[in-house]
């Protein structure tokens, strides 16, 4: 009995990882057919549930939240297959996995349909959204055997979060009190020289995330849809620098009719931040200039980072969260409490009213 109680207590305090990715054979095959395996500037890592669980056990991670990796496939069928695969993993390993479902954007009607299916039938714990999604013309160019030209990419562009066309989707997600996990994707168009020396993940991913969140704030999206909670990846990207600058420029933008009223408090209150990437005490302190400790979450970015590196990074985080006197009070909050509270709050209660 005592052993069971100790084991249960240990599991209850296990780390929650809100940033991990599922990579299925169907996903890889679809990208290969579209000629997009190297879209992000680096090859996709291999993924196996057994290896994921092995790392989680070694590192002391109790629960991982799965999301579809970048880039976004153009096939709604592949998106559905990935969501069903993630749901199956969650079902087969209760307590070890949650998942946030991908959507087949930019088709908003299909996206809402998939969100309903994922949340109601697959019991998804939230929704994953790309910072931008492209239309199908550049995909079709590749499928037809030619590389998309600069003209294709300029004409296609990328539809960023915050675009008015997505209001219907955000209204639905607001009704469902959804947790949304953001992830940066390749910007459209992208100068080919950008990736000559470094992959997109090094710099453009941070720019993409900052751009998408700034776009949502500028349209007051998270104030208008106040039941939505958004997890921003990679230590908040450039937002600790961008938000003060955006605030200072808002009067000028308003004077030039570029933006309307922005409820800064409401928008920022909706944002949570994972610590995947180059976390450190200094980074966390910088993030606390734009948020509060109850909005910080542990994230690994598994399997894009080697297991050994992730384990060492988590050990280092636990140590500085214990040793740094100003951060020590937030240790359990960051490692597991905030994530559990966030995802528990996203689950609908019977008869709940989300219309207000």
Identify the residue ranges that each predicted region occupies:
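Hydrophobic alpha-helical targeting segments used for export or membrane insertion
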Residues: 2-12
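Mid-to-C-terminal alpha-helical segments outside catalytic/metal-binding sites
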Residues: 11-18, 22-63, 116-117, 125, ...
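Hydrophobic faces of well-ordered beta-strands that scaffold small-molecule active sites
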Residues: 16-20, 64-66, 98-101, 127-129, ...
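Catalytic metal-binding/acid-base residues of hydrolase active sites
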Residues: 21, 132-134, 185-186, 236, ...
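Active-site gating loops and adjacent loop-to-helix segments of metal-dependent hydrolytic enzymes
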Residues: 24-47, 146-152, 188-209, 246-270, ...
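Active-site gating/metal-coordination segments in enzymes
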Residues: 62-63, 67-212
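Glycine-enriched alpha-helix->loop->beta-strand junction motifs that scaffold or abut catalytic
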Residues: 122-126, 175-179, 198-201, 225-227, ...
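Aromatic-lined glycan-binding groove of carbohydrate-active enzymes
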Residues: 217-220, 226-266
């Amino acid at each position: 009995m005592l052993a069971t109680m100790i084991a249960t207590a240990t599991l209850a305090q296990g780390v929650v990882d809100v940033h991990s990715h599922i990579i299925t054979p169907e996903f890889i095959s679809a990208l290969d057919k579209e000629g997009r395996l190297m879209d992000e500037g680096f090859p996709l890592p291999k993924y196996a549930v057994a290896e994921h669980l092995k790392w989680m056990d070694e590192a002391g991670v109790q629960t991982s939240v799965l999301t579809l990796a970048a880039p976004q496939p153009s096939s709604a069928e592949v998106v559905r297959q990935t969501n069903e695969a993630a749901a199956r993993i969650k079902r087969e390993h209760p307590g070890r996995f949650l998942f946030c479902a991908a959507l087949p954007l930019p088709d908003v009607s299909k996206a809402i349909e998939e969100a309903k299916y994922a949340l109601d039938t697959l019991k998804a714990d939230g929704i994953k959204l790309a910072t931008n999604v492209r239309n199908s013309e550049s995909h079709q160019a590749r499928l037809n055997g030619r590389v998309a030209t600069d003209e294709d990419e300029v004409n296609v562009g990328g539809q960023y979060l915050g675009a008015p066309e997505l209001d219907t989707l955000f209204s639905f997600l607001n009704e469902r009190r959804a947790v949304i996990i953001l992830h940066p994707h390749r910007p459209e168009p992208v100068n080919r020289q950008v990736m000559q020396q470094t992959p997109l993940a090094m710099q453009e991913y941070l720019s993409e995330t900052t751009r998408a969140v700034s776009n949502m704030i500028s349209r007051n999206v998270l104030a208008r849809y106040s039941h939505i909670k958004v997890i921003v990846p990679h230590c908040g990207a450039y937002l600790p620098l961008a938000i003060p600058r955006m605030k200072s420029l808002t009067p000028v933008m308003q004077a030039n009719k570029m933006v309307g009223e922005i409820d800064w408090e409401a928008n920022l209150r909706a944002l949570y931040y994972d610590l995947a990437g180059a976390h450190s005490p200094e980074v966390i302190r910088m993030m606390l200039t734009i948020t509060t400790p109850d909005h910080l979450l542990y994230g690994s970015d598994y399997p894009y980072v080697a297991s050994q590196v992730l384990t060492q990074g988590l050990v280092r985080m636990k140590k500085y969260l214990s040793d740094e006197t100003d951060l020590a009070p937030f240790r359990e909050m960051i490692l597991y409490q905030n994530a559990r509270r966030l995802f528990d709050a996203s689950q609908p209660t019977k008869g709940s009213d989300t219309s207000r």
